[in-house]
Amino acid sequence: MNQEEKRVFLIEELKKESSVMRGIAVPKEEEAQKMLLRGLMNVRMAKPTSLSFQKVQDEYLQTETENKGITKLSSLSPVAVIPRAAAPDAAPLCGDEAADSSGSEHLCGDEAASASGSEHHTDAFLYLWQGDITTLAADAIVNAANSAMTGCYIPNHRCIDNAIHTFAGVQLRQYCHAYMQEQADKKGASYAEPTGQSMLSPAYNLPSKFILHTVGPIVGDALTEEDCKLLASCYTSCLNLASRHQLESIAFCCISTGEFHFPNDRAAEIAIRTVRDWLMKHPSSTVTKVVFNVFKNEDLEIYRSLLQKT
């Protein structure tokens, strides 16, 4: 099957799962077909698929990503070098009060654990990259998740959670659902993933190896010190978990900006400061390459300006 035939096959298979969608005609236009397929994947609940569906889906998604163009970390140039010989005192994140951004981490039932790595001390490198994070070949990319952790169910929504779940494939929602079920069995049926923690999953059909899912703070009428601490905890927790699994490279999206209303400039300040301080405090960690991934030109300029001062 070519890409169009695979796309139509997947649409027809997903239509069979829903009595509401069965009567919908498959459009002839390529972009309309892509939107329909993505929408059907977005609203699909977590449940097993047939082997034939998964095989075709995997081939289709991997080809789509290849056609968009995969960016390898080796093609990027670092914008800052972080020497890792000593650990400085961390600066306060908001206001005058120093913030504790230790965070915690989750991996399908495992409790928080300290970062680990080799005994060899090496410099770390920061990168700034504007592009689609679902096309980046890093050891791990970070997903700005919500507390339900099973992805965005709004058809064709433009959030990063939707994009990552779409192009990873339906297996990712199943994995995240199983994780949430396990947590609910341990901690109660109403369990929601706490803000500032992280969970590691396979990346399935993405060019990265893993996905780090973290729930950022939702800012209300005004930014608070607690919001800043929780955002820092997202970054720290992801770095701890990446180090624990001996990963070398991690790409952060702009956590909590956009839908969660964290001011872009303050979010960037916290992101860079927290990552820099963590890298300097963990000279033996395997994590040596950190990418700040931006999508909007506004964020590109903010990060570029701040990183020039690093």
Regions found by a protein language model. Name each.
Residues 1-96, 109-310:
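Macrodomain-like recognition of ADP-ribose-binding/processing modules
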